[in-house]
């Protein structure tokens, strides 16, 4: 019995030891297993589907199972914001390929080729004369050809004040042509332009209403394989230009060790431009896939023989199979859906051999800039032609037009007083191919104002031709102010017919006096050209907008400003007006209140700043915004005011710089330059002039660019301010006074006040100014 109990006891101890050992070993194994964290899970039996029908699941921590219940989706990367498409800048002239003989022995220290910049805007630089010809729109298009404008120029967004008016968004589907391929597209049609009733009643609108952007905006394109292929082929041709091939073949005739030095001595940067377009691919192992069969065979051995980057790039380019560049980058594909094509001159090949670009061209027929210029040339010019090009400097001076024949018929006008040597020439212009319903011939009289005989007889000649009903299409007056900047032209311009198709005035480079234009105020002119052979961009060029109220088109197409012209050469071009000027006749001295006194001037400001601000001539130096016909606040405008011919105006008091008729234009215009009349050392102002001067409110301050300035007609001769009145200045008045001293550099911190106004004198002295008192006897220190 004892034996049985003892045996039972031993078995119990043995079984217990085995159980404890098993538990300990299992725990140790579980704890040391690398997969233990993921080997435990809780699953519930429910009515959900067994499988998740998605292709972005994370299988890294998956368990064997008949269900996808515990699988997580891989988060999708956030798409990078797509940059705004930039209109194609007008291409720079292709540099003349360098001659090998000239570059082998350079006289000038080599320059490191510059990396091409990504082309934007605008800028705000003037737009050079375009080069590519405009194409004819397809018959199916409902609108005249044209895409979005260049430059937008970078215009500040309006401050959110009143809610902008909603412009109707009219879209329709149509067939358009892109790169020779007809595709379906959705196009937004521009709505009509709203004209305020005030502008109509006060003769501020263009007699022949002007539309800046008459083409639609492409919203979406149905991209086809045919379109992709045509787009790729367009860029291929530019990547494989004959001049590229010719220059690089010549480069490879040199010894490999000479190539790098030769390229560095290329002052035109021609090779650097070629390298830049392919460098991403050339630095990628992917390049072998885009070589010719011969290139693929030789490349492995050549890799160790390249002695410089230039040697490598030249060899790779020579062995490229350009027909393999058929795919567009994701960016190019995205822009193509919006109707933009990679601009061939700005295109490059990425590391994957796909075509991308720094600039994209709008579809044919949807370039708002070229369409505007073409429409102006055809419908606004008196001697119109079908092209978007402006006239060259030579044709501008000579009065030539594409598609027109010019014949000298001066002898036929001898009977009216014209004689040889008086600087007066008469030409007959005849259209080479007649157009029904349009002007096909006309007579133009050229007058040289620098010729004393011609200048003296001009007025009489115009009067005689008017009396005899001789139909003259246009007058062109040259060298205005060349011999004498104060030369009088008001009487000559007043004598012109009240209705005149064409008037072109050429101002001397040394004279910026345009005050005679006020004589055109009541004349109806179809085309007015204001030109110079000097610097057309100077701030001194000013114009009185009230003189242009009845002009249908001020020529803005004949713009010939470019760094490519020889410095100092006489280049005829239209003038850019960034300053508005007014005359004493614009100020109503007989009115009883300031608003009525300034009505003509404020109407002139409104005409330029808002009503006709969609016209290029009234956009100052920087051009249109994104929607020039409907969002005028986004357009540029003249930033200078010249009151040197209006002595009554002493500050900006009473002047209106906001759009009082259209609440969506909720950003006031601001100034960078103001010129006031003065003829002594002391500039006189009233208390009201200073309290309501608006200098802080309407003058640009603290922004990039040249500092704003206030000047006087007598230059630095103005050194003091005299404040007339028997009151103190308000807080605004003190602030405006401080701004005036800040912007007017000729002023010293000396202020003259009436000797009876001690409170004002003390107020100014406490503000840190030197104060002098005046009586009828003169100045006395106090």
UniProtKB/Swiss-Prot annotation:
It is a single-pass membrane protein. It is found in: Membrane. To U.parvum UU046. It comes from the Bacteria. The keyword Transmembrane applies. InterPro entries: Mycoplas_M_dom, Predic_Ig_block. Residues 77-97, 125-135 have a biased composition (Pro residues). This is Uncharacterized protein UU044. Residues 57-171 are annotated as: Disordered. It comes from Ureaplasma parvum serovar 3 (strain ATCC 700970). GO terms for cellular component: membrane. The keyword Membrane applies.
């Amino acid at each position: 019995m004892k034996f049985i109990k003892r045996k039972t006891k031993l078995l119990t101890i043995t079984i217990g030891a085995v159980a404890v050992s098993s538990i300990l070993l299992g725990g140790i194994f579980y704890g040391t297993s690398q997969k233990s964290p993921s080997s435990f899970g809780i699953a519930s039996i429910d009515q959900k589907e067994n499988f998740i029908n998605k292709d972005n699941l994370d299988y890294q921590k998956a368990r064997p199972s008949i269900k996808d219940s515990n699988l997580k989706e891989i988060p999708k990367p956030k798409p990078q914001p797509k940059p705004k498409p930039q209109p194609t800048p007008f291409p720079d002239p292709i540099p003349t390929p360098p001659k090998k003989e000239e570059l082998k022995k350079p006289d000038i220290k080599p320059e490191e080729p510059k990396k091409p910049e990504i082309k934007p805007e605008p800028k705000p630089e003037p737009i050079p004369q375009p080069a590519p010809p405009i194409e004819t729109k397809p018959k199916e298009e409902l609108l005249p050809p044209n895409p979005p404008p260049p430059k937008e120029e970078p215009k500040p967004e309006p401050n959110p004040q009143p809610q902008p008016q909603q412009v109707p968004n009219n879209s329709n589907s149509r067939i358009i042509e892109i790169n020779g391929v007809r595709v379906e597209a959705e196009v937004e049609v521009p709505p009509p332009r709203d004209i305020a009733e005030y502008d109509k009643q006060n003769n501020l609108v263009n007699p022949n209403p002007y539309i800046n952007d008459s083409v639609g905006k492409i919203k979406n394109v149905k991209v086809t394989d045919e379109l992709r292929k045509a787009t790729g082929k367009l860029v291929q041709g530019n990547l494989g230009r004959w001049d590229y091939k010719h220059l690089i073949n010549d480069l490879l005739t040199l010894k490999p060790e000479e190539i790098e030095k030769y390229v560095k001595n290329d002052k035109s940067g021609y090779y650097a431009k070629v390298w830049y377009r392919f460098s991403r691919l050339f630095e990628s192992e992917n390049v072998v896939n885009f070589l010719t069969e011969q290139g693929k065979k030789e490349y492995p051995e050549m890799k160790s023989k390249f002695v410089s980057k230039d040697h490598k790039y030249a060899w790779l380019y020579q062995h490229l199979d350009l027909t393999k560049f058929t795919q567009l980058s994701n960016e190019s594909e995205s822009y193509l859906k919006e109707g933009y094509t990679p601009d061939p001159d700005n295109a490059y090949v990425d590391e994957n051999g796909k075509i991308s670009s720094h600039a994209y061209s709008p579809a044919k027929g949807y370039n708002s800039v070229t369409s505007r210029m073409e429409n102006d040339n055809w419908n606004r010019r008196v001697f119109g032609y079908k092209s978007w090009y402006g006239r060259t400097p030579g044709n501008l001076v000579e009065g030539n037009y594409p598609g027109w024949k010019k014949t000298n018929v001066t002898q036929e006008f001898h009977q009216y007083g014209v004689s040889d040597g008086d600087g007066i020439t008469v030409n007959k212009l005849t259209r080479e191919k007649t157009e029904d319903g349009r002007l096909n011939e006309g007579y133009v009289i050229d007058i040289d104002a620098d010729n004393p005989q011609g200048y003296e007889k001009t007025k009489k000649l115009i009067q005689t031709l008017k009396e005899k009903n001789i139909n003259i299409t246009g007058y062109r007056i040259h060298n205005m102010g060349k011999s004498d900047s104060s030369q009088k032209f008001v009487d000559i311009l007043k004598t012109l017919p009240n209705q005149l198709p064409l008037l072109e005035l050429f101002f001397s480079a040394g004279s910026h006096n345009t005050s005679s234009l006020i004589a055109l105020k009541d004349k109806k002119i179809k085309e007015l050209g204001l030109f110079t052979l000097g610097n057309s961009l100077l701030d001194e060029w000013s114009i009185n907008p009230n003189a242009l109220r009845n002009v249908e088109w001020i020529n803005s197409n004949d713009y010939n400003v470019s760094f490519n012209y020889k410095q100092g050469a006489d280049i005829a071009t239209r003038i850019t007006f960034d300053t508005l000027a007014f005359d004493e006749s614009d100020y109503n001295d007989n009115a009883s209140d300031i608003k009525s006194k300034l009505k003509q001037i404020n109407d002139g400001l409104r005409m330029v700043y808002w009503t006709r601000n969609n016209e290029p001539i009234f956009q100052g130096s920087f051009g249109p915004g994104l929607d020039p016909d409907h969002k005028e606040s986004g357009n540029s405008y003249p930033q200078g005011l010249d009151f040197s011919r209006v002595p009554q105006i002493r500050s900006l008091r009473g002047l209106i710089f906001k759009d009082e008729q259209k609440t969506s234009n909720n950003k006031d215009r601001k100034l960078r330059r103001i010129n006031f009349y003065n003829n002594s050392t002391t500039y006189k102002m009233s208390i009201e002039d200073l309290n309501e001067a608006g200098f802080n409110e309407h003058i640009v301050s603290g922004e990039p660019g040249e500092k704003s300035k206030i000047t006087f007609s007598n230059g630095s001769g103005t050194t003091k301010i005299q404040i007339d009145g028997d009151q103190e200045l308000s807080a605004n008045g003190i602030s405006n006074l401080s701004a005036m001293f800040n912007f007017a550099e000729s002023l010293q911190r000396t202020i003259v006040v009436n000797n009876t106004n001690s409170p004002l004198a003390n107020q100014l002295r406490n503000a840190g100014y030197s104060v002098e008192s005046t009586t009828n006897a003169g100045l006395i220190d106090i």
